[in-house]
Amino acid sequence: MLELVRQTAPLPAWSDVKSFSLHDLRPLKPVSVAVTHERARLLATSGGLQVRQGTRSQVLREGQFMPLEPGHVTLESGGGAQAVIFEGSWGDELGGCGIFRADNVAAPSDKGDPVAYAKHTNIDAHYHDCQEFWLLLEGAATSVVSGQHLAMTPGDCLPIPMGAVHDMPDAPVPVKAVYFETTLRGQKRTGHLWQHTHGPAVQMEGK
C-alpha cells in the first residue's frame, strides 16, 4: 500500500528518490544546502534563481533543472523563487522532469486507459517504464495509483512504482505540481504508456 511522503519522512525502500527538499528563496537572501546522496537534481519551481556549486554557476527559470554533485550548494534569487531538490540513486537514462498543472473541467478528455471512477481533469490514466514522483506545490487533488485513492495537499510527495497505472482524476483546487521520472528500465519507453496501446502494465515495486 502506497503512502504520501512529506519532506522529513523516509521514502519507500524501493524508491530511486531517497529524499527531497523544498526551498523558498527570499530576494537577495542566499541559502546553503548540503547534498548528501550520490545523485541529485534541482528543479526551479517558480521565479528565477542562481545555483552555485564549486566552480559551477547556473541561472534557472521555472521549469528548468540541473544535476547537482554531493557537497554544498548555494541558491540565490534577486526577486524571490522556489526550487526543489531530489536526492537518491538513479541511472543515467531518465524519463521526464518538470511542472504540470491540473484542474477540474466541464468536459474532461481522456485518451488514457478506461477507469471505473469519475474523471474531472484532463490527466489521463497511464503508466511508465520508470518510477515517477509527484510533488504537489499548490492546490488539492485526488490521485489514483493501482486503484488506491490518495488525497494530496501542498507538500505531499507521491512515489509511483514502475508499471503502476496512475491518474489525477480530481483537482477541486487547481493544482501545480512537480513530476520527476527516474531510471528507465525494461523496454525503456518514454512518455505516457497505455495498456490499450502499449500492452499490459506490470507494477514492479510497492505491492
Feature-to-residue mapping (PLM):
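Generic N-terminal amphipathic/basic segments
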Residues: 1-16, 30-33, 37-50, 56-59, ...
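Double-stranded beta-helix
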Residues: 3-5, 78-115, 171-207
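Short acidic-glycine-tyrosine-enriched beta hairpin
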Residues: 54-71, 146-163
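A short glycine-rich, His/Asp/Glu-containing loop-to-beta-strand
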Residues: 2-34, 88-126, 130-131, 182
